[in-house]
Amino acid sequence: QGVAYAAKCYGCKATIVMPTTTPLIKVNRTKSYGADVVLYGDVYDEACAHAYELAEKHGYTFIHPFDDLTVATGQGTIAMEIFKELPLVEYILVPIGGGGLATGVSTLAKLLNPKIKVIGVEPAGANCMQASFKAGKVTTLPAVNTIADGTAVKTPGEKIFPYIQKNLDDII
């Protein structure tokens, strides 16, 4: 929805590819910003692969939702907001799907306070980052099973994984 909103603000056209299992409220909200929505695949990974194919075929700019350091950096500003509201915070729990949000938040949090503990949280049925974290390398789950569609990812981001390894203290 963020890309759709930004495209609307800048008068750009956006095509957003989402899994067929995406809740209708998210699909409708994305469309309300003027984006074209393509429903494809049963899980995020299939939708992402299709989005990349569309970008290649039509010359679109592909914006990865989590495996993009620029996107993760922007998401990291959440850590600044946390420290502004709670300057003595000792722990931050951050949700993980593909890892972009956790990368941004944990990286900036550790820069602002190297002693802070940042814990990633994933659904048990979609714990691709936890599996990767434990294995020391990006790992693909055979399947995902969660109602939390925003975290239903089989393979976490390759580009952001080193930041996860460096800046997350644990993943539960």
Put a short name on every predicted segment.
Residues Q1-L54, L108, C128-L141, I160:
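Active-site-proximal loop->helix
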Residues D36, D42-D45, D67-D68, D149, ...:
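Acidic-enriched, low-complexity/disordered segments with a strong bias for Aspartate over Glutamate
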Residues Y52-A55, E81-F83:
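N-terminal small/polar loop signature for handling phosphorylated ligands or for N-terminal nucleophile
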